[in-house]
Amino acid sequence: MKRFNIVLIILLSLTLSGLLFLRWKAREEPAVPVIAETAPPAPVPTAAPTPVPAPVFTPTPPPTPAPTLFTPPQGYTEESYNLVRDMVYAYADRQDDATEIIRDDLEQLNALDPALGVLWGKIMPLWSEVNRGLVIHDSILPDGLPEDESLCIVVLGFQLHPDGSMAEELRGRCETALRCAEKYPKALIAATGGGTAWQNPNATEAGVMAAWLTEHGVDASRILIEAESRTTADNAVFTSALLRERHPEVKSLAIVTSDYHMPLGVLLFQEEALLAEYETGTLPFSVVSNAALDTGGRVSPDTPMMQRSYLWSIADPKY
């Protein structure tokens, strides 16, 4: 019995020691968490895809043309305007080689509008004449011009120096005009040219020329000043308007400018007179002569293409 009790005590001691050891071990090594396997999600049933219809391509209609803003000059239809334009551009591009084109266009224009046919039947030969057969008088007007107030000597301006003083070429034109004014003492003198001195806005070519002429003995009452123009076409349009308004007695014009510039000057002043005749029924005046400053053979910048621009700007105010 005594032995049995001893054995029991030993067993209990061993059991208690084992439990204490396990508890101590649990504190040293934390338990590894057990991760339960997650079941995959159940598949979500999807509806069958809706079929997409094939795209239908509708052809794009052509754009609606913009309304035309074309308005021919007064007295012209679109057809007559195009005939005149064709003649002007043909001569500028080809000169004498355009003769057949000009003849055909004039025939059509005469059938379409006889008055316009007559007008351009005068302008187109004039253009050819000033480039091929114009007689240019050196330094002074010839004899035989009107000796009364019906003659006007038109002096074309030239670019001023920035300060408003005369360039040498403009002085030469004034000297030519002075000789002509002394030869024809009853003639009116029209000085034409606007402000071209960028450092002196008060100076104009016409004003400077008029001052020079009066300083050299020309009576100021003989001088008509046109001081608004910027181009030779402006010279022709503005001076002609002043002459018709203030000096209807003038019937003959004599142009004074540089030799190389004379064909353009004669062409534009005579064209303006012919256009006035077309509009009013009366020819106000004609270019009858000229006197040129000799520039020593300076080559003219007034090519037929340049002439076309000026001539067309007078014939078509929208140009």
Task: Describe the predicted segments one by one.
Residues 1-13:
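N-terminal Sec-pathway targeting helices
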Residues 7-9, 19, 35, 57, ...:
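Extended hydrophobic/Leu-rich segments
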Residues 12-23:
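Hydrophobic alpha-helical membrane-insertion segments, chiefly the h-region
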Residues 23-26, 33, 65-314:
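A structural signal for short, hydrophobic/glycine-enriched beta-strand patches
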Residues 27-68:
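Ser/Thr-rich, Proline-interspersed low-complexity disordered segments
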Residues 318-319:
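The feature marks non-catalytic terminal segments
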